[in-house]
């Protein structure tokens, strides 16, 4: 029977302290090796919180699976911001370009329920609503209406 430990760690900066150490300690594996592998696999997500799954089998071998950061973290990293707006409906903190929205959608594509790039970009726009981020200088809901009307079909074709 394999034990599974799921944690959120800073990309490329996991350490043996909480939350990893206390969760992995009782399993009897080399925590330093696990931390090194996590840091190696998450170095591309530097500055973002990344979901990580450590699977330990009965013979104390482990595998590390790295998820993608939340969509909100990817949007904020594209804009080089720390956090979203406290009042997202009235105070907008930045604006994504359509290209940035497509990039975020493609990074999250495997974890999304959307079948098409167009719908994936609309999911990203939905996240932008709660963050107080505009897209192409427009409120996210206006942007979604334009996407539905086909304005960006040339960029959203697969």
Curated annotation (Swiss-Prot):
Protein name: Large ribosomal subunit protein uL11
Coiled coil stretches, renumbered: none
Source organism per UniProt: Methanocella arvoryzae (strain DSM 22066 / NBRC 105507 / MRE50)
Function: Forms part of the ribosomal stalk which helps the ribosome interact with GTP-bound translation factors.
NCBIfam families xrefs: PRK01143.1
Protein family according to the UniProt entry: Belongs to the universal ribosomal protein uL11 family.
A GO molecular function held by the record: structural constituent of ribosome
Keyword annotations: Ribonucleoprotein, Ribosomal protein, RNA-binding, rRNA-binding
UniProt cross-references to HAMAP family, sorted A to Z: Ribosomal_uL11 (MF_00736)
